[in-house]
């Protein structure tokens, strides 16, 4: 809903959840001039259905059915959105916003700027939702031109399977590349007691002069879709089963059980909460080609936070690896 009251839908790539605030009799008195007893009864009727997640358009308002449109408009005017809004790349205002944001980040001392889910940015009706070419590269180059005066290096976050070779394209265009293969390869190597594939990947990075930022745990899950082409499907499935057995959660795409994306778990828990395995994994990461990125929770051997997931409710699976540690917990983990 825009400031002028008009409701304009936007193309949202990831998710969208709408929250409707409950109303009370005083709201209805002011808005519609109702009698208090009627307003109280209608407010109770509306709030009961909101609590049951009934969409306002589908509400049964009983003897106030003639007010249905007015009530819907009123609820819409007070709703809140949870989601990620897509920006219109054709608007000069968006590019002004990008420039100002890059300038501000540079002013804070930033050197590397992660471009989250970047390959979704230049989508268009009738085209793919992800990684349109050459639009993706043209857009990325335009952002690089904005970043250059501030001495900023760009890190495009683009998830794709190994067999698609997108990581090579990113590197060939002169950008830092996220090494999303390392987290899964390390767990596989440790659990299988076989570092052949991991060593092969390290050699490829060196031979092809691919400059990466790598990681173990992160604010999202452990990427497994990316491993296609590096590991056989049965090895990937085995990794999923192992991490889930150790308390992780699988994020399925589009409700299809076999179309996996990430397993959500702390890296420490994914390794069976084994100190030696975690230390070996971190040591290998630090000596792998690339710039190591360390997720704060891994520093303190963070375990799967199932309580946080339960509190977050539906869609809260990522909270398993986002625990806010107290000073006492930090001191305890360091001793």
Summary of predicted features, one role per range:
Residues 1-335:
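Active-site and adjacent substrate-binding regions of carbohydrate-active enzymes
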């Amino acid at each position: 809903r825009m400031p002028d009251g008009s409701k304009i839908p936007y193309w949202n790539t990831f998710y969208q959840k709408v929250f409707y605030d409950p109303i009370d009799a005083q709201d209805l008195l002011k808005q519609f001039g109702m009698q208090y007893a009627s307003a109280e009864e209608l407010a109770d009727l509306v709030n009961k259905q909101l609590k049951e997640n009934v969409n306002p358009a589908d509400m049964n308002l009983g003897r106030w059915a003639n007010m249905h449109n007015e009530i819907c408009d009123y609820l819409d005017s007070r709703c809140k959105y949870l989601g990620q809004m897509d920006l219109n790349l054709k608007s000069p205002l968006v590019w002004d916003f990008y420039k100002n944001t890059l300038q501000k980040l540079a002013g804070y001392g930033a050197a590397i700027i992660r471009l989250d889910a970047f390959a979704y940015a230049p989508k268009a009706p009738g085209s793919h939702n992800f990684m349109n070419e050459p639009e993706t590269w043209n857009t990325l180059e335009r952002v690089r031109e904005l970043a250059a005066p501030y001495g900023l290096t760009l890190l495009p976050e683009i998830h794709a399977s190994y067999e698609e070779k997108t990581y090579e394209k990113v590197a060939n265009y002169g950008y830092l590349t996220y090494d999303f293969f390392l987290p899964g390869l390390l767990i596989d190597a440790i659990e299988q007691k076989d570092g052949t594939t991991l060593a092969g990947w390290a050699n490829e990075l060196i031979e092809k002069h691919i400059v990466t930022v790598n990681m173990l745990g992160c604010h999202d899950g452990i990427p497994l879709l990316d491993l296609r082409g590096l590991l056989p499907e049965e090895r990937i499935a085995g990794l999923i089963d192992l991490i889930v057995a150790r308390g992780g959660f699988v994020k399925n795409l589009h409700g299809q059980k076999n179309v996996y994306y990430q397993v959500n778990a702390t890296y420490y828990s994914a390794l069976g909460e084994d100190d030696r395995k975690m230390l070996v994994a971190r040591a290998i990461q630090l000596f792998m080609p690339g710039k190591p990125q360390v997720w704060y929770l891994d520093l303190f051997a963070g375990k799967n936070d199932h309580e946080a997931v339960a509190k977050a409710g539906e869609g809260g699976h990522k909270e398993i690896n986002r625990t806010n540690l107290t000073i006492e917990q930090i001191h305890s983990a360091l001793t």
